[in-house]
Amino acid sequence: MAAMRRGVILGGVAAGPEGPLVTAARTGRTAVRARAVIRVESAPDGTARLIELRSDVPIVLRQTGASPGRTRAPSTVPALSADALPTATVHLVNATAGPLAGDDLGLDISVGSGVRLVVRSVAATVALPGHGPGPSRFTVSARVAPGGALDFAPEPTVAARGSDHLLVTDVHLATTAWLRLREEIVLGRFGETTGSIRSTLRVDMDAHAEVDPPSEPTPLLRQDLVLGPEIPGLTGPALLGSARALGSLLVAGPDPVGSPAARRESVPAKRAESGAQAAVADGVALLPLAGPGYLISALAENAVTLRRRLEQGPAPATV
């Protein structure tokens, strides 16, 4: 039934209050290609203004909040915590079931100087099998300008049985930009085995502004994760054990102390920000990066426990 609704939506043009919306292009018998765009800049009055919010079915974007910020920050000053910036909040809505096999979906994000963009989703994404060519794919490409901030934390991606899904996240940060990025993966729906899912995370940061001539961006994080029933020993004690949910939380920028995770009195997070050693506890670990930030990785038997471990971080014990 979901596939029938999918065909109806993608076969025509969805009408909006101001005229037709963009329609996703077909790439195969059932596969679709779609690219949505979010661009936020600082308005003359100091607020965060969405200068482009372009949906592309099945990716629907809705602005759900805005705040003026506690102060107006010069774009070159990194001392201001990111949550004090003028903020725009956008939610992602899946207009159809899926993604299905062969779907190629993407989201382009651009954050200007002196503003913050918060991106959330209204529900989990369930990757499903289908008749399209190759795996389904969702790509997020983001650029954050000096003094800008991106808080990207959608709901989990669920790899349903028989699915083959690829997640790609590519972020480019200016020297004084700030990033909070959370990714959560759930292996299968309730009572079923997992599908195959691969996650690639690349985060680069510009060299210091005083370097002349400018050098190539510095890699801040490279992370590849491959999961699925074809992986030998996936549920063994050396890998996931009984865990069915896993994820990571990356915080990077000139003032990570002002991040929401640090304000929760997470002792390991504060240690990481001050250059202390990594911290580890049951199902969760914190790794200081060779740049301004840290990475929390966790696994759990369910999505609720996973979220708590990512947000709170490990216990104060260090290794």
UniProtKB/Swiss-Prot annotation:
The lineage of its organism: Bacteria, Bacillati, Actinomycetota, Actinomycetes, Frankiales. Keywords: Chaperone, Cytoplasm, Nickel insertion. Residues 254-273 are annotated as: Disordered. It comes from Frankia casuarinae (strain DSM 45818 / CECT 9043 / HFP020203 / CcI3). GO terms for molecular function: nickel cation binding. This is Urease accessory protein UreD. It comes from the Bacteria. Residues 262-273 have a biased composition (Basic and acidic residues). Disulfide bonds: none annotated. The keyword Nucleotide-binding does not apply. Belongs to the UreD family. The gene is ureD. Its main location: cytoplasm. One of its GO terms (cellular component) is cytoplasm.
